[in-house]
Amino acid sequence: MHIRILGSAAGGGFPQWNCNCRNCRGVRDGSVAAQPRTQSSIALSDDGERWILCNASPDIRVQIAAFPALQPARRPRDTAIGAIVLLDSQIDHTTGLLSLREGCPHEVWCTQMVHQDLSEGFPLFRMLSHWNGGLRHRPIALDGEPFAIPACPRLRFTAIPLRSSAPPYSPHRGDPHPGDNIGLFVEDLDSAGTLFYAPGLGEVDEALLEWMRRADCLLVDGTLWRDDEMLACEVGDKLGRQMGHLAQSGPGGMLEVLAKVPAARKVLIHINNTNPILDTASAERAELDASGIEVAWDGMHIQL
C-alpha cells in the first residue's frame, strides 16, 4: 500500500493567511524552524498507478502539481485519481471537489450523513451535477464490514464511526450523528499492511483502541498540542474538544493514547498552525521524537 501525504495542516493551512501567531509569523520571517503545509488530504494506492483521494482539500490543485503520479499525462486530459473518499463534510476536506469539476464524473464514497450535508448545507452534489454527470455518490455503510473500491481492488476499507463534530454549517452541529465523521482502517491484501487513518478524532474509547492496535501505521489527529491552545494564542474562543479534536498533551490526550498502541509508525496529521510541534526546535517536538511519534509533512510517502 502506498500512502502519500498531500497536505498535513488543519483548516487554513500553515501559515494561515490571516494569522500572526508565533508559528505563522515565524515561518514567514524564518525565525521558526518550520516548513509550510497545505490543508490535509492523502492519497492511497495498491499499485502506485491508480489512486484513491481521501478528502479533497481546498489546496488540491497545488497538491496534484506537487505529486506527478496523480497526473500521468497518458492522454490530452488525464488523472490517476480513480475515486474520492470523504471522511467528513468539513469545508477544508470537501471544497477541493470544486477544483476537480473539469474531471467529472467522480465516484465519491461517503456516509449518508456526509452526503446529506453536501446536498443541503453545502450542496456540492447538486452544484456539480451540471458538470458532466457531477459526483456519483457511493454510500459507505457503518456496519463494520470491509468494502472494496474498484480503483484499487487490492485494498479493503472499513469505516469506523468517530466521536467528533459535524461542520459549523451542518444543521446537526450540536447534535452528533453516527457517520458525521469516520476513520478508515485500510488493509492491503497482498502485503497485509494495515493503516488506521483519522484526521479528525475527538475521543478514543476502548473499541476504537482495538482498531488502532491492529494497524501497522497510525495517521491520526494532530490538530492541537493543548486543549486551550486557540484561546492561549488569542486566535479563537473554543477548546479543542469543542471542535471535535483530542489534544496531544494532558490527561487522556493523544500522547497517552498512542503509548497504548504497538504500531510501528505513529504519525500526526491535520496540524493546526498554532501547534508548537510544527517548530522542529520546540520542546514539544522533542517530546514527540522521544516517544517515536512522527509529524506528517507535505510530500511524505509511506509504504506498507
From Swiss-Prot:
Transmembrane segments: none annotated. Gene3D superfamilies: Ribonuclease Z/Hydroxyacylglutathione hydrolase-like. It comes from the Bacteria. CDD domains: PQQB-like_MBL-fold. Belongs to the PqqB family. NCBIfam families: PQQ_syn_pqqB. Pathway: Cofactor biosynthesis; pyrroloquinoline quinone biosynthesis. This is Coenzyme PQQ synthesis protein B. SUPFAM superfamilies: Metallo-hydrolase/oxidoreductase. May be involved in the transport of PQQ or its precursor to the periplasm. Pfam families: Lactamase_B_2. The gene is pqqB. PANTHER family: COENZYME PQQ SYNTHESIS PROTEIN B, HYDROLASE C777.06C-RELATED-RELATED. InterPro entries: Metallo-B-lactamas (IPR001279), PQQ_synth_PqqB (IPR011842), RibonucZ/Hydroxyglut_hydro (IPR036866). One of its GO terms (biological process) is pyrroloquinoline quinone biosynthetic process. Keywords: PQQ biosynthesis, Transport. It comes from Pseudomonas paraeruginosa (strain DSM 24068 / PA7) (Pseudomonas aeruginosa (strain PA7)).
